[in-house]
């Protein structure tokens, strides 16, 4: 019975050792892959950093202020365009009224001229 226990313990220890080796190998592979990807990402980050210069906060603030200034100017222009469009509509309406009045005046004159000739 002691031999069976010893054999069983040895078998369990071998299983533990095999399992530990498997886990160690898997962990080493995962760490290696992680290290490679980390290294690749660091290289890529450096490549990006060189290619695209990151602006400092003062420069970003200046850009935001310029953008806001341009938006304000655009809004002012849009309001002027709206004003001139309305003014144009009113002028067209006035022109139409003047044409009608001119025709009425012409008709009156023509009637008046025809009455004075008789």
Curated annotation (Swiss-Prot):
Subunit composition and interactions: Component of the biogenesis of lysosome-related organelles complex-1 (BLOC-1).
Family: Belongs to the BLI1 family.
KW Secreted (keyword) present: no
Protein name: Biogenesis of lysosome-related organelles complex 1 subunit BLI1
Domain of life: Eukaryota
Organism, scientific name: Zygosaccharomyces rouxii (strain ATCC 2623 / CBS 732 / NBRC 1130 / NCYC 568 / NRRL Y-229)
Pfam families (UniProt xref): BLI1
Localization, UniProt: Endosome
Residue stretches in coiled coil: 55-104
Physiological role: Component of the biogenesis of lysosome-related organelles complex-1 (BLOC-1) involved in endosomal cargo sorting.
Gene Ontology cellular component list: endosome
Gene that produces this protein: BLI1
Keyword annotations of the record: Coiled coil, Endosome, Transport
């Amino acid at each position: 019975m002691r031999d069976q226990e010893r054999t069983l313990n040895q078998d369990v220890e071998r299983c533990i050792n095999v399992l530990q080796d498997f886990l160690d190998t898997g962990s080493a592979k995962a760490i290696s892959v992680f290290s490679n990807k980390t290294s690749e990402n660091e290289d890529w980050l450096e490549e990006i950093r060189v290619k695209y210069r990151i602006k400092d906060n003062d420069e970003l603030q200046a850009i935001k202020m310029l953008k806001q200034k341009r938006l304000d100017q655009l809004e002012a222009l849009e309001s002027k365009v709206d004003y001139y469009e309305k003014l144009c509509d009113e002028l067209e309406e006035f022109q139409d009224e003047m044409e009608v009045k001119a025709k009425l005046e012409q008709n009156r004159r023509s009637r008046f001229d025809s009455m004075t000739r008789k």
